Design a protein with these regions (language model features):
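Short, low-complexity N-terminal intrinsically disordered segments enriched in polar/charged residues
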Residues: 1-39, 142-143
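A beta-strand edge to alpha-helix "cap/lid" segment located at domain peripheries
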Residues: 2-13, 74-143
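Hydrophobic alpha-helical core bundles mediating ligand binding, dimerization, or RNAP-core interactions
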Residues: 21, 28, 40, 69-73, ...
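Hydrophobic pocket/interface hotspot
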Residues: 21-24, 35-37, 44, 65, ...
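Short, flexible active-site loop motifs that bind/organize anionic cofactors or intermediates
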Residues: 23-26, 55, 80, 130
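A solvent-exposed, acidic/Ser-Thr-rich amphipathic alpha-helical stretch
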Residues: 41-89
Length: 143
């Protein structure tokens, strides 16, 4: 079962939105930021819903999300194609999706990264429109 429906009875919009969410996290995990840019709605927002860590707060639009937020983290701190976002649970209802995931990877300094996440997404026009990210911010503050 996915999203409260047996898969064979999942409405087409929910199947499509599940595919969009899975493609988004696969592309993010691969570090393919230019491809990721195309999966984001032009008016996308990405909210880091924690306090007290670098990067917390809202990011608006593709440029800020990719160039000012994701690129410095992924290319500055981690080895290529890290960290991976591994979906553990995905629930889709209409244009909304909830994801429980693990972030696994390796920093350039050789240290391992292993964090837990919850993401809440809204899809609009077959693109990621709004994303809210929750994580273990205490873990991040100790790195």
């Amino acid at each position: 079962m996915r999203g409260g429906h047996k898969e064979e009875f999942m409405p087409d919009v929910e199947k499509r939105n599940e595919e969009i969410v899975r493609a988004f996290f696969e592309t993010l995990s691969a570090g393919e930021l230019e491809k990721l840019r195309l999966l984001l709605h032009e008016d996308a927002t990405w909210g880091i819903m924690v306090t007290g860590i670098q990067g917390a707060g809202d990011k608006h639009g593709r440029k800020e999300i990719i160039d000012d937020f994701l690129k410095p983290i992924r290319e500055g701190l981690f080895i290529p194609a890290n960290p991976k976002v591994v979906i553990q649970h995905l629930v889709v209802q209409g244009q909304y999706a909830a994801v429980e995931a693990k972030g696994l990877g390796k920093f350039k300094n050789g240290k391992d990264y292993n964090n837990r996440y919850a993401f809440f997404l809204e899809i609009k026009d077959d693109k990621i429109f709004h994303l809210r990210e929750y994580m273990d911010s205490y873990y991040v503050s100790t790195l």
